């Protein structure tokens, strides 16, 4: 499987062969589903909370007499059918976190990479290592690659380059992705992936291992 390679200015150089350890493993939609579902669950705070009738302040006395008023009998103004009353079976704080095995996470990442490669949505670029903050220079790279205006772009780089990270922050639809901490959603929900040469080697070392 091949991909287009660009220099650090975003100019096309040649087509390169993608490593089979990453891009010849097949696609498992089930693994992708499980991984994204677990990531979404782990991002939930679970702090939602409502009060039942025993927790709502007030309502300890009957609002009116049991008989003689012509109205339906009531025991408390905090009953669920009153405005301001307790909530029946409402949400309470809970932990939504979900555990995902390393093998499933690995299979999901490889499946997404294979899917993007099959759709010709992966590009390889020489390592971009700016020595200062420059949003314009990063945007010009994407513009030269002709993907600046073609939906979301995931920029996968090796490690944390603060100059590069901050330079990508103000570019709409561009997501900075650290190859050492890949999140499935960050690579799945992008139309195109731009992977630096160092990041490709990092992914190869990390995900080509068995287990």
Swiss-Prot record:
Region of interest called Disordered, as start-end residue ranges on this chain: 42-73
Domain of life per record: Bacteria
Transmembrane segments: none
SUPFAM superfamilies reported for this sequence: Ribosomal protein L4 (SSF52166)
MF GO annotations: rRNA binding; structural constituent of ribosome
Keyword entries, A-Z: Ribonucleoprotein, Ribosomal protein, RNA-binding, rRNA-binding
One Gene Ontology cellular component: ribosome
GO biological process: translation
Family under the similarity heading: Belongs to the universal ribosomal protein uL4 family.
Role this protein plays: One of the primary rRNA binding proteins, this protein initially binds near the 5'-end of the 23S rRNA. It is important during the early stages of 50S assembly. It makes multiple contacts with different domains of the 23S rRNA in the assembled 50S subunit and ribosome. Forms part of the polypeptide exit tunnel.
Complexes and interactors: Part of the 50S ribosomal subunit.
UniProt protein name: Large ribosomal subunit protein uL4
